[in-house]
């Protein structure tokens, strides 16, 4: 059937997005101008070298051929930012590149070391020494971090003024390329509104500017930013200094985000020229998505007694699972849900709470991961957001769910489907690991990984969102992983959507990766390629490792293919049936 994409403003959520607002350049390739390369290795460190020193020894050996670095030590330019190990004994390292002490946007690397101390693979993007000479703007910005924040909020304010509130559902038919059928997209943002900042207008007079080496961050009072079209930041605004590769140039920029909920939810990342204050690139990154639940099913869950009532608070998992209600307003987290007798009658709250616990348990038992960040992060959810709000989203710190369209004809409460809850919380996992840019192919990978995990949590079928979409139509859903074309998604790379809507097709092109995952798990013959399925258990272990340990923020589909195959080799052996199936599954989808 023809799919309707609902969205209330320029943010990419569970169901889709509005075209991104003002942007100095619009490219499906996204903000990161660097494309990672993948190398398989079997380099063995000397026996006297162990731990992090294996990584440094490998990079020093490869610094000219792999990194394009000759005259300086790799330790001067690269920093290890994270290290993990998996159940097969492989250690995974994440690194970032710095030039003149300033991080380079998108210049990230992952290196993988086997249990015997051998480097098995490398994935990364770097700025070589010739390119570093293009950093002609130096290290000192001509505008302050507070001015960059102001520029971002002023642009967002202008864009939000043209948008409806959450009481409205807006849509506009848009013809898409024949490879992606017709969709109905919500379109409201004005793509020509790039606003400059007059320094005399800057009202962040109470902002405190903090400097840490070459990184300048601004902690602006929310009341000051709120003067701009009454926008109230959900987190303290900050701007970080980066070098940004653009063509042959290496620009000095600030990277900042606008994160607001009123008058409508918006989370946009801005890359702002640190010399003239112009917006180099921007894109939206809101990630969409005993008592009775929404479907009337009874379930048990953990609450906390407080005086004469009970709170929807679980203190047994990580740092807790807490569920609030926004009472159909647009403020979060809202009010903590309570009940007098511990027999709960808020189905949306029950499901959000129970399914958050289910997702926590899934990650803990399947992958040994302690919550979204791996360190027990509290899982906070808000239900009853807005009025007739047809979406769900992860805003970087918590989950928020709308109640659907009100009469239940198209959508019921979004917390009523465990694969939707798992999908959205997995956006949080991605943010703490690969941090895939929510644009173009990297954004489609971001969406696909959330679909993979959300679907595996429920394991009912190969559909996404079928429990909350068109409840009166049996078998209807938002997406199908086994047959993406049922819901206007491509299932082969030859049909890749190359337009700019939906952040470059993040919800569209995810169908290609979903199909590859389905073939890996279930098997089948597709486009003349036969894949012997390895089962869901092995398939999800491979994808989890590939997406959390191997990929970097600007990874594309070819990187995902290499990462999935390498993860299969590391987990099950280089000549294993799993590794063969992983390669075949991507052959099948192009």
UniProtKB/Swiss-Prot annotation:
Residues the record lists as binding Ca(2+) 1: 339, 341
A GO term, aspect molecular function: metal ion binding
Catalytic activity: Similar, but not identical, to that of thermolysin
Species the sequence originates in: Paenibacillus polymyxa
Keywords associated with the record: Calcium, Hydrolase, Metal-binding, Metalloprotease, Protease, Secreted, Signal, Zinc, Zymogen
Record family assignment: Belongs to the peptidase M4 family.
Positions bound to Ca(2+) 3: 466
UniProt EC number: 3.4.24.28
Binding-site positions, Ca(2+) 2: 419, 466
Cofactor: Ca(2+); Zn(2+)
GO cellular component term, pick one: extracellular region
Pfam families: FTP, Peptidase_M4, Peptidase_M4_C
Subcellular location per the Swiss-Prot or TrEMBL entry: Secreted
Enzyme class: hydrolase
Pro-piece positions: 25-286
Role according to the record: Involved in the generation of beta- and alpha-amylases from the large amylase precursor.
The protein's name in its UniProt record: Bacillolysin
Signal peptide range in chain numbering: 1-24
């Amino acid at each position: 059937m023809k799919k309707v994409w609902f969205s209330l403003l320029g943010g990419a959520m569970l169901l889709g997005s509005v075209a991104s607002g003002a942007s100095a350049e619009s490219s499906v390739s996204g903000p990161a101008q660097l494309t990672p390369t993948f190398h398989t290795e079997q380099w063995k460190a000397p026996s006297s070298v162990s731990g992090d020193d294996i990584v440094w020894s490998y990079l020093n050996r490869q610094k000219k051929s792999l990194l394009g670095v000759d005259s300086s030590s790799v330790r001067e330019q690269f920093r290890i930012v994270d290290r993990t190990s998996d159940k097969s004994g492989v250690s995974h390292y994440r690194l970032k590149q710095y030039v003149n002490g300033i991080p380079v946007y998108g210049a990230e690397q992952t290196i993988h070391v086997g249990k015997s101390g051998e480097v098995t693979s490398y994935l990364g993007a770097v700025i070589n020494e010739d390119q570093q000479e293009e950093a002609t703007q130096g290290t000192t910005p001509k505008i302050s971090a507070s001015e960059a924040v102001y520029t971002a909020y002023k642009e967002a304010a202008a864009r939000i003024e043209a948008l409806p509130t959450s009481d409205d559902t807006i849509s506009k038919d848009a013809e898409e390329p024949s490879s992606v059928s017709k969709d109905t997209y919500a379109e409201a943002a004005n793509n020509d509104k790039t606003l400059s900042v007059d320094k005399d207008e800057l009202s962040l007079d109470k902002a405190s500017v903090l400097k840490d080496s070459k990184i300048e961050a601004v902690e602006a009072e929310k009341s000051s930013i709120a003067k701009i079209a009454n926008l109230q930041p959900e987190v303290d605004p900050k701007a970080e200094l980066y070098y940004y590769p653009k063509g042959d140039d290496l620009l000095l920029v600030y990277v900042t985000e606008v994160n607001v909920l009123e008058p409508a939810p918006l989370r946009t990342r801005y890359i702002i020229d640190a010399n003239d204050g112009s917006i180099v690139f921007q894109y939206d990154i809101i990630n969409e998505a005993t008592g009775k639940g929404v479907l009337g099913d009874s379930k048990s869950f953990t609450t906390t007694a407080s005086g004469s009532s009970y709170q929807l608070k679980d203190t047994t998992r990580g740092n807790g699972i807490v569920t609030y209600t926004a009472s159909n307003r647009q403020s979060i987290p809202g009010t903590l849900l309570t009940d007098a007798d511990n027999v709960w009658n808020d189905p949306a709250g029950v499901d959000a709470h129970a399914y958050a616990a289910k997702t926590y348990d899934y990650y803990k038992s399947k992958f040994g991961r302690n919550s979204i960040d791996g360190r027990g992060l509290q899982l906070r959810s808000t239900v009853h957001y807005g009025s007739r709000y047809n979406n769900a989203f992860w805003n970087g710190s918590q989950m928020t769910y709308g109640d659907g369209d009100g009469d239940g004809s198209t959508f019921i409460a979004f917390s009523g489907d465990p694969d939707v809850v798992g999908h959205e919380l997995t956006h949080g996992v991605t943010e703490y690991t690969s941090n895939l840019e929510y644009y173009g192919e990297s954004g489609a990978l971001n969406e696909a990984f959330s679909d993979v995990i959300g679907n595996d949590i429920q394991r009912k079928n190969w559909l996404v969102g079928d429990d909350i979409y068109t409840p009166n139509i049996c078998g209807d859903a938002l997406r199908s992983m086994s047959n993406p074309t049922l819901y206007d998604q491509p299932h082969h790379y030859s049909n890749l959507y190359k337009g700019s809507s939906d952040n470059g097709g993040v919800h569209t092109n995810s169908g290609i990766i979903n199909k590859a995952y389905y073939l890996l798990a279930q098997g089948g013959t597709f486009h003349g390629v036969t894949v012997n399925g390895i089962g869901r258990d092995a398939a999800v272990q491979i994808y989890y490792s590939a997406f959390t340990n191997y990929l970097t923020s600007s990874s594309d589909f070819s990187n995902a293919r290499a990462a999935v195959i390498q993860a299969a080799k590391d987990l099950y052996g280089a000549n294993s049936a799993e590794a063969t199936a992983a390669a075949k599954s991507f052959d099948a989808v192009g």
